[in-house]
């Protein structure tokens, strides 16, 4: 039982600026030590014969811009399961699976660990050519199309080739694709579907659509991309700039982003909604895979029940994070080239073409007689009209899906981000 609840970004501009490109080069560093705790409480439904919970052990990880070091991981169940196993899947994820049969009325799982997370944004140098050519055998699976990452679809292939025409470096190809994503994909949740093709056709989606479409466009031109699932924390941070401050705040809950493989940098994190070549230290990296249907193991609930039984188990999840230390020193400079929407990137020494963004035309001059005709005299709706209604944010889980005769599963969702 697991469904992803993408976190919405809250961004507050504390100054006025003209319309145009919103590409910011960010330098500096973030360092923190976080005490992380997650609690899941499962209440069985009538007729439940077996309950199975699985979790992924968050790994330590290091890239040129983001580093995560995990200490003291602990997972406690109450009551104790009948069986508990730990294994590693073919992506390297360490998975713990616990089984209860018969099932108690209620099960509690508590995860705790310390995470030392650091984001360092200094000048990167990359000369990886485009096209890449042959990649290592452990990287090649992340070039494959899937049902959620349809990199072999003619429409996706056509757009990817158009965006990367005449490009000679991987950084330039990735930047052009990501620029198109942030300028053309609009955030909504929950979307009708979570795959790349839906995002392309509807031009909207949640974090899964942003991740899947970015991965599909890059894989279509032979750039390896893997999907990352984890958690974002809601502690805000500031980026200073001349004339003001940018304040960023994510919702606290499940999130999906990507990592892109460069020949000279290795795997580097991106959040296709806002950042290139890094994520902030408010991200807890947990599970990787080829798409979000593969990365379902962390927080997955499965059960079997007597034939004809109605109802499903109820699952409540809470996440807390205590920052024992937190140091942030970041500054940003706004560039004169694209995209139009917000994108943050560290300084990069590489060959690339700046994407020019034409400023919008000045608004038309409206005379006072014309203005009187434009005044609204009846109520009207405005704002985010696609914000979901009647969502219980305390129980962020997706609908149950059938996996066999009288057997079901429920995955995490990415709805909590919308609550922010």
What is each of the regions a protein language model found here?
Residues 6-16:
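Bacterial N-terminal signal peptides
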């Amino acid at each position: 039982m697991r469904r992803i609840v993408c976190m919405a970004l809250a961004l507050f501009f504390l100054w006025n600026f003209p319309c145009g490109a919103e590409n910011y080069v960010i330098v500096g560093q973030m360092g923190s030590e976080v005490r992380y705790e997650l609690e899941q409480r499962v209440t069985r439904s009538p007729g439940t014969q077996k309950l199975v919970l699985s979790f992924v052990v968050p790994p330590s990880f290091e890239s040129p811009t983001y580093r995560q070091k995990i200490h003291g991981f602990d997972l406690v169940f109450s009551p104790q399961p009948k069986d508990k196993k730990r294994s590693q899947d073919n992506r390297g994820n360490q998975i713990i699976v616990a089984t209860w049969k018969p099932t108690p009325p209620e099960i509690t799982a508590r995860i705790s660990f310390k995470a030392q997370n650091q984001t360092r944004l200094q000048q990167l140098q990359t000369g990886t050519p485009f096209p890449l050519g042959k990649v290592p055998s452990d990287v090649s699976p992340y070039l494959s199309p899937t049902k959620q990452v349809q990199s072999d679809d003619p429409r996706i292939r056509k757009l990817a080739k158009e965006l990367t025409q005449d490009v000679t470096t991987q950084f330039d190809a990735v930047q052009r694709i990501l620029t198109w994503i942030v300028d053309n994909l609009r955030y909504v949740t929950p979307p009708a579907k979570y795959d790349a093709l839906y995002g392309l056709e509807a031009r909207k989606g949640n974090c899964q659509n942003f991740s899947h479409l970015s991965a599909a466009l890059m894989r279509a031109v032979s750039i390896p991309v893997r999907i990352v699932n984890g958690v974002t924390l809601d502690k805000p941070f500031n980026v200073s700039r001349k004339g003001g401050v940018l304040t960023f705040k994510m919702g606290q809950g499940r999130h999906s982003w990507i990592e892109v493989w460069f020949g000279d940098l290795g795997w580097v994190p991106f959040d296709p909604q806002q950042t290139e070549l890094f994520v902030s230290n408010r991200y807890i990296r947990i599970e990787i895979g080829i798409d979000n249907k593969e990365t379902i193991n962390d927080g997955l609930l499965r059960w079997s029940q007597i034939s004809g039984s109605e109802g499903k188990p109820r699952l409540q999840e809470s996440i807390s994070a205590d920052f024992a230390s937190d140091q942030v020193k970041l500054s940003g400079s706004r560039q004169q080239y694209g995209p139009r929407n917000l994108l943050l990137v560290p300084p990069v020494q590489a060959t690339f073409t700046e994407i020019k963004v034409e400023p919008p035309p000045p608004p038309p001059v409206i005379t006072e007689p014309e203005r009187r005709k434009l005044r609204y005299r009846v109520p009207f709706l405005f704002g985010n009209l696609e914000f979901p209604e009647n969502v219980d944010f305390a129980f962020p889980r997706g609908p149950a899906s059938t996996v066999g005769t009288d057997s079901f599963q429920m995955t995490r969702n990415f709805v909590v981000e919308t609550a922010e």
